[in-house]
Amino acid sequence: MTKKIISLLMIFATLLIITLVSYFHYNQLPIYDINLASKFILNEQTNNDFDEISEILGFDSTDKLLIIHADDLGLCESVNSATFESFENEAISSASVMMTTKEISEVSEFSSKNQNYDLGIHLTVTSEWKYHKWGGILNNEDISSILNKKNHFYWNKRKFTKNGKLNEIRKELQAQVDLGRSMGLNPSHIDSHEGALFFDPDIFKLYLRIAEENDLLAFVPSQASVHFDQNFKKPKHAIIIDQFHMLPEGTEINQIKDYYFNVIENLSPGLSQIIVHLGKDEKELREITIDHPNFDYRWRQLDYDIFNSDEFKNHLKKHDIKIINWKDLKKLI
C-alpha cells in the first residue's frame, strides 16, 4: 500500500512538473528557478504604497494615474515618425529607445530639439524578427554568450536566459545606457525589450543594479514583482506598475480598439501603464515584420491611429484619467 501511494505521488509530481514546464514554454516564459516559478503561479505580487506615491506626485489616492508608453523607438523610420508625431499630438507620454538599431540617430536629433519629452532606454538582448536582425553594442567577442553563430542576439528569451553570462550581460546593458547618453538622450528610466530581463532572478537583479548605478528608474511590471520578498526587498529605483496593460499576442485586428477602450473603462485608482507599439503601414515596416503577426505593421498602424484619435483622448477625459510619465516618477527617489 505504501509503495502504491509513493508511486502515485511520484506520478503526480512528474505530471505537475511536465505541466509547469509546458505552461512556461508555451507562454515563452523562461523561468527555470523553482521558487520563482511557484511564486509566479501563485501570483505572489508585491504592490506599491499608492497613498505615498500619490502624495509625493501631488495627486489624491483615488486618482487614476496612467503612463502611455511607446516601445521600440529607433526600430525604423516608420516607428520613429509615428512616435515623434504621437509625442507632438500628446497621444503618448513616454517612450523607450532601442540602442541596437540603425535608426537611432533620428531619435538623437529629435531628442536634442525636444528635451521636454520623456525617453527611456529599451534594453535589448533579443532579436525577434525573421530577417531584420541586430547584435550588441560591444564587440562580439566580449558578449559571445548572448549571440548566435551569426553574431546576432538570440531570437527568443529562452536561449538568452539559458546561455547568457552575467558579466557579459552587465557589460552590454551598461554599454546601451552609455551610448544613449553619449548621443544626447537624457533617459529617465530603463525597461526590457520583450521582457527578457525579468525571468531569471540573477538577471533581474542585474537589471535593477544597472538602474541604481545610473540613477535611472527601472520599470517593473506587476507580474515581475514576484521576485521581491523578505530576502530581496524592492530597491527604491524599482517602480512597480500595479496595472500593466499591453495588447495580448493573438488579438484579432478587429478587437484591438475595443481592448484599449475597455482597459480605460476598467482602470482602478493607482499607477498604471499601457505599452503601445506605434508605426505606419509602410514598405519598410512590412518587410521588418514579415511572418510575425504579433506587433506587425497592422498592429502598429492601429495603435498609432487609436491613440492619436480624438475619440480615444475624449475617452480618457470621460474616465478622468491623469496622464503622467517616467520623469514625474523620478520624484519618488
Residue ranges of predicted features:
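N-terminal pre-catalytic segment of deacetylase/amide-hydrolase enzymes
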Residues: K3-I67
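Active-site beta->alpha N-cap acidic-glycine motif
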Residues: D51-K130
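Acidic (Asp/Glu)-rich catalytic clusters
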Residues: I56-G58, T83-N89, I104-D118, G135-N148, ...
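Structural preference for beta-strand elements that scaffold enzyme active sites
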Residues: L65-I67, I92-S96, N116-H122, P187-D191, ...
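Active-site beta-loop-alpha junctions enriched in small/polar residues
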Residues: L73, T100, H122-E128, H193-G195, ...
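Active-site gating loops and adjacent loop-to-helix segments of metal-dependent hydrolytic enzymes
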Residues: W134-K159, I290-D296
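Catalytic domains of cell-wall/extracellular-matrix polysaccharide-remodeling enzymes
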Residues: K165-F244, P248-K257, E265, D305
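C-terminal domain-boundary segment and adjacent tail
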Residues: A218-P221, H292-I333
